[in-house]
Amino acid sequence: MDVFKKGFSIAREGVVGAVEKTKQGVTEAAEKTKEGVMYVGTKTKGERGTSVTSVAEKTKEQANAVSEAVVSSVNTVATKTVEEAENIVVTTGVVRKEDLEPPAQDQEAKEQEEGEEAKSGGD
């Protein structure tokens, strides 16, 4: 039973790690895009400078929004995948459902931690 718990836990950790790297990559890309747009803005000067700054900020905001959507989607897929894997081992009789459920205290701590991460933006 512990083998399955540990295996599912490792799977979750792997997905979370991948999500964080994806989010970090999108954020870095947004910063570089902003830098490029700002560079063009400083070279063109004049009235276009303000427009370029606005475009750079909007580009960064949109990239961050996409990043958040990707993170949310991947988390949903990961959760469903692990849930289905748990269902399979329970349905086939390899493990009892009670053996897979974490103790109530652990579950409450996990939910509280997830709530805090959501408030802080996952940082």
Swiss-Prot record:
GO terms for biological process: adult locomotory behavior; aggressive behavior; cellular response to hydrostatic pressure; chemical synaptic transmission; peripheral nervous system development; protein secretion; regulation of cellular response to stress; regulation of dopamine secretion. The keyword Protein transport does not apply. Sequence repeats lie at residues 20-30, 31-41, 42-56, 57-67. Plays a role in neurofilament network integrity. May be involved in modulating axonal architecture during development and in the adult. In vitro, increases the susceptibility of neurofilament-H to calcium-dependent proteases. May also function in modulating the keratin network in skin. Activates the MAPK and Elk-1 signal transduction pathway. The modification Phosphoserine is found at residues 67, 72, 120. One of its GO terms (cellular component) is neuronal cell body. It holds the Pfam family Synuclein. It is found in: Cytoplasm, Perinuclear region; Cytoplasm, Cytoskeleton, Microtubule organizing center, Centrosome; Cytoplasm, Cytoskeleton, Spindle. Specifically expressed in the peripheral nervous system. High expression in motoneurons of the brainstem. Also found in neurons of many other brain regions including the cerebellar cortex, thalamus, hypothalamus and CA1, CA2, CA3 and CA4 regions of the hippocampus. Belongs to the synuclein family. May be a centrosome-associated protein. Interacts with MYOC; affects its secretion and its aggregation. Keywords: Cytoplasm, Cytoskeleton, Phosphoprotein, Repeat. Residues 107-123 have a biased composition (Basic and acidic residues). It comes from Rattus norvegicus. It comes from the Eukaryota. Residues 20-67 are annotated as: 4 X 11 AA tandem repeats of [EGSA]-K-T-K-[EQ]-[GQ]-V-X(4). One of its GO terms (molecular function) is alpha-tubulin binding. This is Gamma-synuclein. Phosphorylated. Phosphorylation by GRK5 appears to occur on residues distinct from the residue phosphorylated by other kinases. The keyword Manganese does not apply. Residues 93-123 are annotated as: Disordered.
